[in-house]
Swiss-Prot record:
Phosphatase that hydrolyzes non-canonical purine nucleotides such as XTP and ITP to their respective diphosphate derivatives. Probably excludes non-canonical purines from DNA/RNA precursor pool, thus preventing their incorporation into DNA/RNA and avoiding chromosomal lesions. Binds 1 divalent metal cation per subunit; can use either Mg(2+) or Mn(2+). Coiled coil: none annotated. InterPro entries: ITPase-like_fam (IPR029001), Non_canon_purine_NTPase (IPR002786), NTPase/PRRC1 (IPR026533), YjjX_NTPase (IPR050299). PANTHER family: NON-CANONICAL PURINE NTP PHOSPHATASE_PRRC1 DOMAIN-CONTAINING PROTEIN, PTHR34699. One of its GO terms (biological process) is thiamine metabolic process. This is Probable inosine/xanthosine triphosphatase. It catalyses: XTP + H2O = XDP + phosphate + H(+); ITP + H2O = IDP + phosphate + H(+). It comes from Caldivirga maquilingensis (strain ATCC 700844 / DSM 13496 / JCM 10307 / IC-167). Homodimer. Keywords: Hydrolase, Magnesium, Manganese, Metal-binding, Nucleotide metabolism, Nucleotide-binding.
Amino acid sequence: MKVALASRNPSKVKAVEEALRILNINGTVEAVDPPPGIPPEPMGLEATVNGAVVRARHALSSIKDSTYGIGIEAGVLMLSAFNVNFDVTVAAVIDRKGLITLGLSPAFMIPPAFMRELMTGKELNDVVEKYYGVPNAGKGIGFIGLLSRGLIKRINLNTEAVYMALLPRMPWNKDLYELSD
């Protein structure tokens, strides 16, 4: 099976490979450039899901012999009632019938100082670099890797989002999710 991924980010490519391995899916990942026009820091769950779905559709249409297209998008989940914001990763998996399944990673709180900068239009990667002095952390251990001092890495969050999105497609779950071949 060939899986198309709308990202060349090494963390995302490795995450999809790892999710396939965990679920015992024999497949290869082919990375393509993401589609143009995706906002760098989606605000809200719907915007983040939409970004993942747009990426997944683009991946599927870019690799004609792929079984699935996968999009992975990190964004900000806002809980205004508690004045708290979370970083969350959403994975979308689309097949040739157009069926989309979604998965989310664990989410972690974004520090208020970081959030203030994001609200001015800055990208999280730039804010992380300013505070930690690590350029392009998103292509490596990620913001979570820096916050957790390496205990949790971005690849872990990406992997969990992807296998959560693939779980409904597993043979033992298809009936539960009312999916047909």
